[in-house]
Every structure is written in C-alpha cells, then in structure tokens.
C-alpha cells in the first residue's frame, strides 16, 4: 500500500502538470467557436457563379493557417484548375465529384460523400462537379492561396 507521502506526491504532480494546460486552455485569446448559424456566406469570385465562401479561421489571402467552407449549388461544374499550395479537404454535406487531370473526363470522377477527407497536393490539375444536391466542404491550408485555371477563358475573374 502506498504511503501518504507517495499519495500526496502523486496528487501534487498531477496538479502541477495539469495546471499549465488548464490555464493555457482557459486563457487562450485565439480560441474560436463558430456554429452553423454564425457562418457568413459571400460570393466566391474566383470560382464560377453560384460558389460561396465562409471564412472560419485566418484568411486565404494572407500568410498563415486558414480554414474555409465552400458551398456549391447543385449541378455546378468546376473547370480544370490547380492551387499553388497544399491543402486538406473534408466534405461536410452533399456528394462532391472530383478527378485529377488536365482534361475534363466525367468517367474519371470519383464520389466524395459527406465525411470524406482528401489531401490535395500543390499544382495538381483537377476538375469537379456537383450533381443533384448542394455541396459544402471545408478546406484548410497555409495562405496565401489562389486558384489557377488551365484555360484562361474559364477564370471568372477575367473579363470575357
């Protein structure tokens, strides 16, 4: 049976080890919580009409970690594009269809149902679409980021 000195020592160790962690969690000025009702959606001009963005953390236009939600309407087509940075994507709702390649080929599209996680390497040509439902996905990466279209005519930011 442990002595009372050992028990007190163990309790003191636990208190001393846990206190800085609890203190750090309680005092973190960067702690953020966003519930769906608080999302602020706005048009995403770098993607075809109908795409929307909600910034959850950081800024995709500035250096540092960012997390965004992207909302795409049903029957949305995203032309061949790439990103200069590495990113991770998680599908929140709806089924997203995506493929790697520098030419749209519907037979290559893979379904990404809700909950699907994917790692997207930098500078990889890809294309995507939604079908009969709206899709929301989360992107986390290190900014600044951008989207580059293989065919300049597909870039909605450029005058037609």
Each model region followed by its residue ranges:
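Bacterial N-terminal signal peptides
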Residues: 9-19
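Short acidic-glycine-tyrosine-enriched beta hairpin
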Residues: 96, 102-123
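Double-stranded beta-helix
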Residues: 30-33, 107, 127-160
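Glycine- and acidic-residue-biased ligand/ion/polar-headgroup-sensing regions
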Residues: 73-76, 82-103
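Conserved short histidine dyad/triad with adjacent acidic residue
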Residues: 66-83, 111, 121-122
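Short beta-strand His + acidic residue motifs that chelate non-heme Fe in jelly-roll/DSBH
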Residues: 78-80, 98-99, 120, 125-131
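A short, N-terminal "cap"/entry segment at the start of jelly-roll beta-barrel domains
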Residues: 23-66, 153-160
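His-enriched metal-coordination microenvironments in redox/metal-binding proteins
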Residues: 47, 60-65, 79-90
């Amino acid at each position: 049976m442990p002595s009372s000195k050992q028990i007190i020592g163990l309790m003191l160790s636990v208190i001393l080890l846990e206190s800085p962690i609890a203190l750090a969690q309680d005092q973190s000025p960067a702690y953020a919580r966003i519930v769906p009702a608080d999302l602020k959606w706005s048009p995403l001009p770098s993607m075809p009409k109908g795409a929307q963005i909600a910034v959850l953390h950081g800024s995709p236009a500035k250096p540092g970690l960012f997390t965004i939600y992207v909302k795409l309407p049903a029957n949305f087509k995203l032309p061949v594009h790439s990103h200069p940075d590495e990113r991770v994507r998680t599908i929140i709702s709806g089924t997203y269809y995506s493929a790697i390649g520098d030419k749209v080929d519907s037979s290559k599209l893979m379904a990404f149902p809700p909950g699907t996680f994917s790692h997207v390497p930098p500078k990889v040509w890809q294309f995507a679409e939604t079908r009969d439902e709206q899709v929301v996905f989360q992107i986390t990466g290190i900014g600044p980021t951008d989207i580059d279209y293989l065919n300049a005519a597909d870039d909605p930011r450029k005058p037609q």
